[in-house]
């Protein structure tokens, strides 16, 4: 912008200008329809008017860009990005999306390479927006740095178990170097398969299926010789959540028409545990929320495997009944095959690498 004002834009190569535009495009792809952004790592929750002003400034740089115009004018002019789901494979951010308006379903998954100080050890975590509400917001950062008491608070929000991912004995990840095994953003069974060497002796493979562009099936596999308690952690937004620890079911009862049902099916005996849950909405501001983990005692080298169905719905009064099971009887490096049932309608989901 300053180069334009001073008449020096031509001094910058086209590649540089394209890089700036690509950065804007990446940001648009990971944001939700209300212009808010995922609060991964040390990110702050964006302010809608400020974000719209940003797009208005960017439109001055790229006046012929239809999709920047769309976001700068709140959809009154231009057109949205031509894609729905989007993967940034180098940085490891993946978006499942069925639309650009308020009633859209949008999941953003963070599964990239090692980051530095501002990056939290949260590989495999996600946020999920549905019909105007972020149902699984990140814990955020709460505070940055200070004395021992301040760092205790910071470390609670940045720790791995405060995110929507898998841990062993609730310990922070030793390695944060996710590898994308498969990314298919098209069709009625969109798939992401990502793998991270969480700990010495234990890797985590997470496979996400976006089914019929309406609900999600997540397969988590903890593989290796390490022993301990495997925890599959989920953190919901604030509000009323009904917890059925016997059936491993969470159903939300939020005001409005954005709710969901989650049910976890563990291959081995598992216990569902409610635990302390918070999310930070601004610096030094936090609100309580429902947080749970599904715990499995891992005593040997056999993989610990889970299937989770997350079903967003506008109607909190009635959710479908779920069943799920693995069809491949043990962990397979080359793929997975499962069967799910939604209100009695069976369906097989699978991939091969």
Residue ranges and their predicted role:
Residues 1-136, 185, 299-305, 328-353:
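Carbohydrate-active enzyme catalytic cores, enriched for enzymes
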Residues 23, 141, 226:
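A generic "binding-loop/recognition-motif" signal
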Residues 33, 102, 115, 132-134, ...:
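Short loop/turn segments at secondary-structure transitions that flank enzyme active sites
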Residues 42-44, 48, 52, 146-353:
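CBM-like, beta-strand-rich accessory domains located in the C-terminal region of large
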Residues 111, 139, 168:
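Active-site donor-binding loop signature of nucleotide-sugar glycosyltransferases
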Residues 129, 142, 245:
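Catalytic-core segments of enzymes that bind and process phosphorylated/nucleotide-bearing substrates
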Residues 137-139, 145-147:
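Cytochrome P450 core scaffold surrounding the K-helix E-X-X-R motif
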């Amino acid at each position: 912008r300053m180069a334009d004002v001073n008449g020096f834009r031509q001094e910058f190569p086209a590649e540089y200008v394209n890089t700036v535009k690509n950065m804007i495009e990446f940001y648009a792809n990971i944001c939700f329809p209300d212009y808010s952004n995922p609060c991964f790592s040390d990110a702050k929750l964006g302010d809608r008017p400020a974000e719209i002003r940003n797009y208005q400034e960017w439109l001055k740089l790229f006046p012929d860009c239809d999709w920047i115009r769309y976001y700068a004018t709140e959809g009154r002019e231009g057109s949205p990005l031509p894609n729905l789901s989007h993967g940034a494979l180098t940085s490891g951010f993946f978006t499942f999306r069925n639309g650009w308006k308020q009633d859209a379903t949008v999941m953003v998954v963070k599964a990239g390479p090692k980051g530095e100080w501002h990056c939290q050890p949260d590989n495999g975590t996600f946020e999920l927006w549905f019909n105007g509400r972020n149902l699984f917001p990140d814990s955020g950062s709460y505070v940055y740095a200070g004395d021992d008491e301040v760092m205790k608070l910071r470390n609670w929000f940045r720790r791995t178990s405060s995110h929507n991912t898998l841990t062993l004995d609730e310990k922070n990840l030793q390695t944060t170097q996710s590898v994308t095994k498969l990314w298919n953003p098209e069709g009625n069974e969109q798939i992401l398969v990502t793998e991270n060497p969480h700990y010495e002796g234990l890797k985590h493979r997470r496979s996400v299926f976006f089914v019929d562009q309406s609900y999600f099936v997540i397969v988590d596999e903890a593989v290796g010789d390490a022993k301990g308690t495997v925890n599959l952690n989920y953190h919901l937004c604030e509000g009323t959540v009904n917890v059925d620890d016997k059936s491993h079911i969470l159903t939300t009862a939020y005001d409005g028409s954005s709710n969901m049902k989650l049910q976890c099916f563990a291959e081995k005996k598992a216990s569902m545990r409610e635990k302390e849950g918070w999310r930070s909405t601004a610096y030094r501001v936090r609100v309580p929320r429902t947080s749970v983990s599904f715990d499995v005692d891992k005593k040997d080298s056999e993989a610990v495997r889970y299937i989770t169905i997350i079903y967003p719905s506008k109607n909190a009064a009635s959710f479908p009944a779920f069943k799920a099971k693995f069809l491949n009887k043990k962990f397979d490096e080359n793929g997975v095959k499962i069967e799910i049932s939604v209100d009695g309608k069976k369906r097989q989901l699978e991939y091969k690498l």
